[in-house]
């Protein structure tokens, strides 16, 4: 194990000099330094540049407070490695794979794997087309998720990305019993804490491994924590042969951390100040999130859209890798429609007759047609009023409004805030409900009865309570 000494510390960037003749650490190797020689105060550094003359530049995974020039640095000879396997379920880790949940310390001899790996080769990949039922009507009907696919949840600040992710974890664990890996990348510590305790109370935590690198962490930790979560998920796929759900909240923070690191390393910025290696870094992460012949990793990624600008390079780069997009719209939150999924902007390559079936496809496309026509008529209604519409258009507007409200539903994870029990709606029931609305079977039921309910039976029951 070769050793060097700290030459300079600039925030999270640490330069380490090795004696001439010593073997230099390789790129991505983990180096260890102890603050003031105290073994309990370990800081892990990752090699990012070799500057020549025995000097390497590293990024710290933890705070560099207390590091001084001249401290001894040890080369571990390998990349950062994290625990994998069934023992990770129910536990919470940081970027280095250290347990941070105050439970029993993780076994020293536990199996570990490096966070830097190559993506599976072409001949290992699987191309199945099976739908993953979420129990959320608007998603299952209009932008269904593929098992083993990549899903992006796009939205600005405060439109409900994290709540939607929490509901998906809840539904998939309760209804499918699947294993989930939740990766918190640069988000609020409070949200991570709330999620952990909610999952513990509901028992979902037993099927979930959680990895956090939150907002207060150095950029190196926020950039690498997504790889830590992915490594845990890959083990379940490749060794255990399981179908795994990988939740990443938020993939934008991964890009943001990469941008900070890039600037600290002195690289020339590209468009909007992002790192020149943006597409490469995103590709290296996304290409590892895939399905093989052994198992699948279905990833659901929350993607913050800065200032609601979808042309920003960070969300635009993520778009290229996705099978389904779920776009959250602020106007819908203002109307009190949750989840605030835009039914016309959201899309999925799974919405074809070959994958979802003819009836589902026909109902979904008709729902989109009705909503699109309603959107076109809204300008006329705003200027001239409903009276100027033909009878046919008035009927269409009534059905469109019922559809719009029926796309909302209460969430199980939001029950503590709303006081309303959440609902899980199977796909067949969702398709049947919307087909009945399109056929005009419920034209007499007041629009308010369709708001924040589960299946069509719930609408009828709510209408009876309203004494319509």
UniProtKB/Swiss-Prot annotation:
A UniProt-annotated Pfam family: ATP-synt_VA_C
What is known about its subunit structure?
A: F-type ATPases have 2 components, CF(1) - the catalytic core - and CF(0) - the membrane proton channel. CF(1) has five subunits: alpha(3), beta(3), gamma(1), delta(1), epsilon(1). CF(0) has three main subunits: a(1), b(2) and c(9-12). The alpha and beta chains form an alternating ring which encloses part of the gamma chain. CF(1) is attached to CF(0) by a central stalk formed by the gamma and epsilon chains, while a peripheral stalk is formed by the delta and b chains.
Note the CDD domains from the entry.
ATP-synt_F1_beta_C, ATP-synt_F1_beta_N, F1-ATPase_beta_CD
Which reaction is catalysed here? ATP + H2O + 4 H(+)(in) = ADP + phosphate + 5 H(+)(out)
Compartments where found: Cell membrane
The uppermost taxa in this organism's lineage are: Bacteria, Bacillati, Bacillota, Bacilli, Lactobacillales
Protein name per the record = ATP synthase subunit beta
The gene it comes from is atpD
**Can you tell me which family this protein belongs to?**
Belongs to the ATPase alpha/beta chains family.
Tell me how this protein sits in the membrane.
Peripheral membrane protein
* Molecular function GO terms recorded: ATP binding; ATP hydrolysis activity; proton-transporting ATP synthase activity, rotational mechanism
Q: Where does this protein chiefly localize?
A: membrane
- Positions bound to ATP: 155-162
* One GO cellular component term: proton-transporting ATP synthase complex
Protein keywords: ATP synthesis, ATP-binding, Cell membrane, CF(1), Hydrogen ion transport, Ion transport, Membrane, Nucleotide-binding, Translocase, Transport
Function text: Produces ATP from ADP in the presence of a proton gradient across the membrane. The catalytic sites are hosted primarily by the beta subunits.
Per the UniProt entry, the Enzyme Commission number(s) are 7.1.2.2
